[in-house]
C-alpha cells in the first residue's frame, strides 16, 4: 500500500457511527483551536495528524487500524495538568503501563532531542517513551477522558 494524502472525508469513510462522531468532534475542536490537520494512508492503516500552530509540533494522531480507532496524544505539558492523569480509566492506565520505557530517561540511550515523559499516576512512577505512552483505543468509556486529555494539552500549549 502506497502512502497517499487523503481528505478528511476519505479518512473517515470506513468508521462506524460512534467513532465517526468522536473523530468529527475532535477534528472540529482541533481546527477551532488553530491546529493544522493532515491525513495519510500508511502501511498499517490511516493516520490523521494535528499540529499545534503555536508550538509547531504534533499534538495528537488519530490512527485507524483493523482493530479500531486509536488516539496518540503528545502530552508535552503533562506537568501542568498532572492531577488529571489520576482520573483516567483503569484500561487507560494499563495502556500507559504497557508502553515502552523511555531509553533516554532510564539509561540515556535515546535521542537527546526526545525528552520522554516522567510522571506519576497515584503512587506509581512512570518513565515512558513519548511515541506510545499516551496511545489509547477509543471506546465508549475512554472517549470522554481522551477528549479531556486533548483539551488539557491544547490549553497548555495555547497558554505557553
Annotate each predicted stretch with a short phrase.
Residues 1-160:
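Charge-dense, helix-prone N-terminal extensions
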Amino acid at each position: 500500500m502506497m502512502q497517499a494524502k487523503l481528505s478528511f472525508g476519505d479518512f473517515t469513510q470506513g468508521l462506524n457511527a460512534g467513532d465517526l462522531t468522536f473523530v468529527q468532534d475532535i477534528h472540529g475542536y482541533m481546527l477551532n483551536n488553530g491546529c493544522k490537520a493532515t491525513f495519510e494512508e500508511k502501511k498499517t492503516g490511516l493516520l490523521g495528524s494535528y499540529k499545534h500552530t503555536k508550538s509547531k509540533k504534533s499534538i495528537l494522531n488519530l490512527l485507524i487500524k483493523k482493530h479500531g480507532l486509536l488516539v496518540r496524544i503528545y502530552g508535552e505539558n503533562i506537568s501542568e495538568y498532572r492531577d488529571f492523569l489520576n482520573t483516567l480509566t483503569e484500561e487507560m492506565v494499563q495502556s500507559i503501563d504497557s508502553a515502552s520505557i523511555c531509553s533516554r530517561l532510564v539509561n540515556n540511550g535515546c535521542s537527546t532531542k526526545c525528552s520522554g515523559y516522567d510522571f506519576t499516576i497515584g503512587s506509581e512512577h512512570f518513565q515512558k517513551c513519548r511515541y506510545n505512552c499516551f496511545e489509547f483505543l477509543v471506546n465508549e468509556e475512554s472517549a470522554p477522558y481522551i477528549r479531556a486529555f486533548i483539551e488539557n494539552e491544547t490549553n497548555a500549549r495555547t497558554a505557553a
